[in-house]
Structures are given as C-alpha cells and as structure tokens.
Regions:
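Mid-chain, well-packed structural core segment of small domains
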Residues: 69-104
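TPR-adjacent "capping" and linker segments in tetratricopeptide-repeat scaffold/adaptor proteins
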Residues: 3-20
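Register position in tetratricopeptide repeats
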Residues: 31, 65-66, 99, 132-136
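Structural signature of alpha-solenoid helical repeat scaffolds
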Residues: 13-14, 47, 81, 118-121
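Start-of-helix register in tetratricopeptide repeats
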Residues: 20, 54, 88, 121-125
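Alpha-helical adaptor scaffolds
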Residues: 19-83
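TPR/TPR-like (Sel1-like) alpha-helical repeat modules
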Residues: 98-121, 127-134
C-alpha cells in the first residue's frame, strides 16, 4: 500500500512521491551538466501541474544555472503570479534581478520574501542576498 498522496491540481493523477522523484531527476540531470534532459523533465512537470509555482521555480533554477538570467527572471515571475504568497518565488525573482543589475527591484523582492515567511529557508537566502548587496558583491 502506498503512503504517498495524490497531488491536487494535476492534469492527470500523479502521486506526491512520483512528482518528487521527477523533480529530483531533473535536478540530478542539471548537476550532471545535462540541461536538455533537465529541461525536458521540468517541462513535463510543468505540463502535469500547470497551476503550480513549483515547476516554474525548477525552470528558474535551470535557466539560472545556464546563465540565462532573463529567462530565469521570467520563470520566477510566473511562479510569483501563480503563488504570490511564496517566499521562495519572491527570493528567486530577487536573485535574478540582482544578476541583471536591477538592484532596487531586487531589494523589493527580497524584502517581500523575508516578510512572507521570516523564518523560512527562502527568507534566509533572501537575507544572504541582501548582505551581498550591502558588501558590494553586485555593484
């Protein structure tokens, strides 16, 4: 008997465990320097969950790793549109904006991430990016 639950909002029935495995596979391919395979997996998850920010954040990470900062920003912004309450999505927007040298906009997104979930890993990441701004990393 499976202890995994079906994922709500999926276009076809898929269990949480299977979705997690797909995402982990996509990240593994990314680590193995196989971005095409990673993109195929993340795009497949996006097709399964068209209303979830999770695949958008995965695509953000993929584009970011490839140095495609405008595409990373677009995916992160789409994640925010899908879930405005996601600190991770706001932090991802802030990070992409920093690498595009759009510091004032980045600060706004980072502050939003921190205010949404102050004790979360996303907020900690946003705080670290704010510190990097302060010491001139993105100048």
């Amino acid at each position: 008997m499976s202890d995994s639950k079906p994922v709500e909002g999926a276009v076809v029935p898929v269990e949480q465990r299977d979705l997690q495995l797909m995402l982990e596979s996509g990240y593994l391919y990314l680590e193995l320097q196989k971005p095409t395979d990673s993109q195929e997996i993340f795009s497949g998850v996006e097709a399964l969950l068209p209303k979830s920010e999770v695949p958008q954040l995965a695509l953000n990470h993929l584009h970011f790793a490839k140095g495609e900062f405008p595409k990373a920003l677009a995916a992160a912004k789409k994640a925010v549109e899908m879930n405005p309450g996601s600190a991770a999505a706001h932090a991802a927007v802030g990070e992409a904006l920093l690498f595009l040298k759009r510091i004032p906009e980045a600060r706004e997104s980072l502050k939003r991430a921190i205010s949404l979930e102050p004790d979360s890993p996303a907020a900690e990441f946003a705080k670290a990016l704010e510190e990097a701004i302060e010491v001139g990393v993105f100048a």
